[in-house]
């Protein structure tokens, strides 16, 4: 929200310690921390409505993370609201609230709103973090996400991921199927369509910033175009006409290059394109199918899947195509690798066969080839689970999940999220069927 939402005050009071232990979200499942998000004080009716809505969004963000348990306002004892008083901590401890959020909303002469909040530790009776934001009314939801991000970061030690966007493919349930690129907040709010559904579209990807996306469009069965769309202006342009491409490019961390797979002469290989010159550089060779490339966060490595040894497995190579190393060694076929923004893990889809037929799995493994022979961990499975992508803090994975048709109901596809630990799986609500999610970085 840079240039739109800015922080006037970074810290209202200095705090050096607090009673709550920092939540480590890699160490299995822990009981959610009980938190009370109190009613925000408001100086007029418009501010009161805004404050009420913000409390709901903040509470929902924290609840969806699986790390916090918002306490019902019906059990609150203390009636005071706002940030200008010290809470009656005993009253909050009585309802088992370890954390307390107080806030206030004021309407300014400019028409904007000043939003303040304080996070309290009720056990030590200390403030943990507090800030003041100034926002136009239409960005109140982003302000709420920003506050939830600050709370999440203070308690977990990791950056929050609530002020983010998801781009995905929306698919109508009626025949003929209509696929459109859609954009929404990370929690499913503010859904809007970016394409008109007149052509087949696939695999939307964010550019280095969240201001632009790229996607594949089938103008005809033989003509496949990669489009760039500016989300601020709505303008769209063709990046290139790439016969044989099946997935949109993934972009290097510096935004200067992108990698993609292109099928030619019976083989599919990884190519890197210089976005300034549009020149292609082939990175893989030999026979076989090499697809789904993804850069490491520092841009020096690329992970991809290849069937060069008969069964699709995952490989890592330098960004110039050298030093190829296999990193997957389990049974089954591997696909769709995605490198964590933190650089520590790679998420993937894995297809295994059993007596009941095929099972799709989403898993993670360590990104270091020397460490990953025994590091693979499956975090969810189903009839169809695919297309994993990471939250910007590398601690949540979003993916597409499908169900088959039956005599009672048609098949469907939805978007889900799950924690790195394999817990807290939840659906991200969309107006229609959805697939191919891609998570933006935290918005400016």
From Swiss-Prot:
<keyword id="KW-0131">Cell cycle</keyword>
<keyword id="KW-0732">Signal</keyword>
<dbReference type="GO" id="GO:0051301">
    <property type="term" value="P:cell division"/>
</dbReference>
<dbReference type="Pfam" id="PF04052">
    <property type="entry name" value="TolB_N"/>
</dbReference>
<dbReference type="GO" id="GO:0017038">
    <property type="term" value="P:protein import"/>
</dbReference>
<keyword id="KW-0132">Cell division</keyword>
<dbReference type="InterPro" id="IPR007195">
    <property type="entry name" value="TolB_N"/>
</dbReference>
<dbReference type="InterPro" id="IPR011042">
    <property type="entry name" value="6-blade_b-propeller_TolB-like"/>
</dbReference>
<dbReference type="Pfam" id="PF07676">
    <property type="entry name" value="PD40"/>
</dbReference>
<comment type="subunit">
    <text>The Tol-Pal system is composed of five core proteins: the inner membrane proteins TolA, TolQ and TolR, the periplasmic protein TolB and the outer membrane protein Pal. They form a network linking the inner and outer membranes and the peptidoglycan layer.</text>
</comment>
<comment type="similarity">
    <text>Belongs to the TolB family.</text>
</comment>
<dbReference type="InterPro" id="IPR014167">
    <property type="entry name" value="Tol-Pal_TolB"/>
</dbReference>
<comment type="function">
    <text>Part of the Tol-Pal system, which plays a role in outer membrane invagination during cell division and is important for maintaining outer membrane integrity.</text>
</comment>
<feature type="signal peptide">
    <location>
        <begin position="1"/>
        <end position="19"/>
    </location>
</feature>
<dbReference type="GO" id="GO:0042597">
    <property type="term" value="C:periplasmic space"/>
</dbReference>
<dbReference type="InterPro" id="IPR011659">
    <property type="entry name" value="PD40"/>
</dbReference>
<protein>
    <recommendedName>
        <fullName>Tol-Pal system protein TolB</fullName>
    </recommendedName>
</protein>
<keyword id="KW-0574">Periplasm</keyword>
């Amino acid at each position: 929200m840079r240039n739109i939402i800015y922080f006037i005050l970074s810290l209202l009071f200095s705090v050096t310690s607090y009673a709550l232990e920092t939540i480590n979200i890699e160490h299995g499942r822990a009981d959610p921390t009980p938190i009370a998000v109190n009613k925000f004080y408001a100086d007029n009716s418009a501010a009161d409505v805004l404050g009420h809505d913000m409390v709901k969004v903040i509470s929902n963000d924290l609840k969806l993370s699986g790390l916090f348990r918002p306490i019902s306002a019906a059990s609150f004892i203390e009636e005071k609201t706002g940030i200008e008083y010290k809470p009656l901590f005993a009253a909050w401890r009585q309802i088992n609230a370890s954390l307390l959020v107080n806030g206030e909303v004021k309407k300014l002469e400019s028409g904007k709103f000043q939003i303040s909040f304080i996070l309290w530790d009720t056990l030590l009776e200390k403030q943990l973090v507090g800030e003041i934001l100034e926002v136009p009314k239409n960005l109140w939801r982003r302000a709420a996400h920003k506050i939830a991000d600050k709370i999440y970061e203070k308690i977990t030690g990791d950056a929050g991921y609530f002020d983010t966007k998801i781009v995905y493919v929306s698919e109508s349930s009626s025949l003929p199927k209509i696929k459109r690129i859609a954009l929404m907040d990370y929690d499913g709010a503010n859904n809007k369509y970016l394409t008109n559904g007149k052509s087949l579209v696939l695999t939307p990807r964010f550019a280095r910033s969240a201001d632009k996306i790229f996607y594949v469009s089938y103008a005809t069965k033989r003509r496949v175009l990669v489009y760039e769309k500016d989300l601020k202006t709505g303008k769209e342009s063709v990046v290139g006409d790439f016969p044989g491409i099946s997935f949109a490019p993934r972009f290097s961390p510096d935004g200067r290059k992108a990698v993609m797979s292109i099928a030619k002469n019976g083989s599919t290989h990884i190519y890197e394109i210089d976005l300034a010159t549009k020149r292609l550089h082939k990175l893989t060779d030999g026979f076989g199918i090499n697809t789904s490339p993804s850069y490491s966060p520092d841009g020096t490595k690329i992970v991809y899947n290849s069937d060069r040894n008969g069964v699709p497995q995952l490989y890592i190579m330098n960004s110039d195509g050298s030093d190829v190393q296999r990193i997957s060694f389990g049974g089954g076929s591997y696909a769709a690798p995605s490198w964590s923004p933190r650089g520590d893990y790679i998420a993937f889809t894995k297809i295994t066969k059993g007596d009941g037929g095929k099972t799709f799995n989403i898993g993670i493994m360590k990104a270091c080839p020397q460490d990953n022979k025994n590091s693979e961990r499956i975090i969810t499975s189903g009839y169809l689970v695919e297309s994993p992508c990471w939250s910007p803090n590398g601690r949540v994975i979003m993916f597409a999940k499908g169900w088959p048709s039956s005599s009672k109901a048609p098949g469907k596809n939805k978007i889900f999220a799950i924690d790195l630990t394999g817990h807290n799986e939840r659906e991200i609500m969309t107006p229609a069927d959805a697939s191919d999610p891609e998570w933006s970085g935290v918005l400016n």
